[in-house]
Amino acid sequence: FMENKIDIIDVTLRDGGFTCDFNWPMLFAQEYYDLMSTLGVKYVELGYWKQTNKSQNRFFNLNMDTVREVTGGKGRNNVSVMIDYHYCSKDLNDYPTNEQNEIKMIRMTCRKDMVKEGYEFAVKLKKHTGLVIAFNLFNTTNYTDNELDSALDIVLKSDFDMIGFADTHGHLNLYEDIFRYEHFLHRIIQSD
């Protein structure tokens, strides 16, 4: 008998940041973070870590000062931040490590033409930071089945804590595509 466990990653502040140019009022972000933490949400994703390509605002260009301002320095170790491999810094020293107690996870998105390089960077990032690393293949509705299988051939060699698919632009119709993705999800589960 295997016990199923579901951990929730709330991405409202990060994903919703696109609606407000990543410029949430700090009081709202603080109250939202506290609510999600009180409800037992395992990870609360605040925004993008030190990226500036799409916005100069603080929830797209997160740093430790902003993270601590949102969390109140409570040290709950439940913050997630996202990086987009295409745009992120490739200097490992630009990332938080497990020596702090706010950020627990880095989720990295990767385009299909960068999976190999993104994988190699994420492996180094995991080793350097000691944090939970989630690897997201995004825009997956633009992949062929062979491309998704090839991407999984690469990333399943890792010890990433999570591997996921992202429907970046809202084209995924699980009603129609569930059986297609079922194959790929089984590959991930069986590799564990």
Where are these regions (language model features)?
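Short, well-ordered secondary-structure micro-motifs
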Residues: C20, L92, D145-E147, L174-D177
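Conserved, mostly hydrophobic/aromatic
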Residues: G16, M36, I106, I163
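N-terminal small/glycine-rich loop or linker at the start of catalytic domains
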Residues: M2-D21, R76, H128-F138
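Polybasic, low-complexity association/targeting segments
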Residues: M2, D145, D161-G164
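Charged helix-capping and loop-helix junction motifs
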Residues: P25-L27, F60-D65, E147-D153, D177-F184
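Active-site beta->alpha loop and helix N-cap motifs at the rims of alpha/beta catalytic domains
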Residues: S37, Y43, Y48-A151
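Catalytic alpha/beta core domains of metabolic enzymes, predominantly
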Residues: M162-D192
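Alpha-helical scaffold segments that flank or form the walls of functional sites
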Residues: F28-K42
